[in-house]
Design a protein with these regions (language model features):
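N-terminal targeting leaders characterized by basic, low-complexity, disordered sequences
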Residues: 1-34
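N-terminal Sec-pathway targeting helices
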Residues: 33-51
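Perimembrane helix-loop junctions in membrane proteins
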Residues: 35, 53, 66-70
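Alpha-helical transmembrane segments of integral membrane proteins
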Residues: 42-46, 182, 261
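Alpha-helical transmembrane segments
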Residues: 51-59
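Hydrophobic single-pass membrane-insertion segments
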Residues: 58-72, 352
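Domain-terminus/edge residues, biased toward the C-terminal soluble/receptor-binding domains
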Residues: 224-228, 236-354
Length: 354
């Protein structure tokens, strides 16, 4: 404010002028503070709204994922899985495995099943061929849909001939051999036998095609939105694919089944006695064997599933338990043996053991 007399000479303000100036200053300060409070309230309201929406999303996902026919009470592990599903679009926020020079696998996902936390990931949402990790779904669908796995199944000549033409891994059943559903299950999981997988498909659904439909329906139920199956074995096919994230959902779900967990963590199994194999066939886990045969320590790993085709590379799903905490690791696309095993050993050592 300009305090000037009639002659233009600046003079000191009067008491009234000082009071007026101070009042205007106080009013301006009060207006600024009110504006700041309004802005703060709006910010808080926005944060509260976001939290409400997140809570609603979690509740909605829980409802969708509920498989108990109306029961929406989730266990701690189920809630952890829901939280991990929500994180799919946020994978970039998790620590990407940076030592690319020392890691052969193209896709990686390490999860703490107890908390649902993604500990380590690399290209986890990228769709790729998954080879015999497909058989995890084959086992799940068979376990859930065959009323009695003691039921007999006669291995067909056409299955044996087809697998031979594909140079596929087999458990060693003979054409015409009468085996049980349990034999087929262990045959598919431990030595990754195509005869076990195709036998399970026929035993469960009556045909390979009908069984594949069941596999895809289960994938949809589990929220495996980046997954599609075209066969029960994992043979290379452009239409048979998944990603590390989806496979973690499948593997976690499968491990909740006591029978699957027992099979996946077994190191050996002997099939029932038949005319063709009076002493049964001794099956050996390619997970246990893969670590041991290559001189790589298993650490806390107690089971899992291997996979290999030329297009898919070396794939591995492992289950580990340390200090009461459960972990699953999916690695896909390692260039050659034993890199999928050494990758697993390295990742567990760095992110779990330390």
């Amino acid at each position: 404010m300009n305090y000037s007399g009639s002659n233009g000479i600046r003079r000191p303000p009067t008491d009234r002028e000082r009071q007026l100036a101070e009042r205007r200053s106080r009013e301006a300060l009060a207006r600024r503070r009110r504006a700041e409070k309004r802005a703060k309230r709006k910010k808080i309201a926005a944060i509260v709204l976001v939290l409400i929406l997140i809570a609603a999303a979690i509740y909605a996902i829980a409802l969708i994922r509920d498989r108990a026919g109306g029961n929406v009470v989730l266990s701690a592990k189920e809630l952890a899985a829901v939280k991990r599903e929500e994180a799919l679009e946020e994978l970039k926020d998790y620590p990407v495995y940076a030592d690319a020079g020392g890691l052969s696998s193209k896709c990686v996902l390490l999860c703490d099943l107890t908390t649902g936390k993604v500990i380590c990931e690399k290209n986890a949402a990228e769709t790729v061929k998954i080879a015999s990790l497909t058989k995890i779904m084959t086992a799940v669908v068979a376990i859930e849909n065959v009323p009695d796995l003691n039921a007999g199944y006669t291995m067909s000549e056409s299955v044996i001939r087809y697998l031979r033409s594909e140079n596929a891994s087999v458990a060693g059943f003979a054409a015409g051999e009468r085996v049980t559903g349990y034999d087929l299950l262990y045959a598919a999981m431990l030595p990754s036998g195509g005869d076990g997988a195709m036998g399970l498909a026929d035993l469960t659904a009556g045909s390979q095609e009908a069984f594949v439909d069941m596999m895809n329906a289960k994938a949809k139920e589990l929220g495996m939105n980046r997954t599609r199956f075209t066969n029960a074995t994992g043979f290379d096919d452009d239409g048979n694919y998944s990603c590390a994230y989806d496979l973690s959902l499948l593997f976690e779900y499968a491990l909740k089944n006591d029978l699957f967990r027992k099979v996946a963590t077994s190191s050996t199994y002997t099939t029932s006695s038949t005319a063709e194999h009076p002493g049964g066939i001794k099956l050996r886990s390619t997970v246990y064997g893969g670590f041991a045969d290559n001189g790589i320590g298993m650490g806390d790993v107690i089971g899992g599933k291997t996979g290999y085709t030329y297009d898919a590379g070396r794939c591995l799903a492992t289950y580990a338990v340390k200090d009461g905490e459960e972990y699953i690791l999916i690695t896909l696309g390692a260039s050659r043996t034993p890199y999928h095993f050494s990758d697993a050993n390295k990742i567990y050592s760095e992110f779990v053991d330390n």
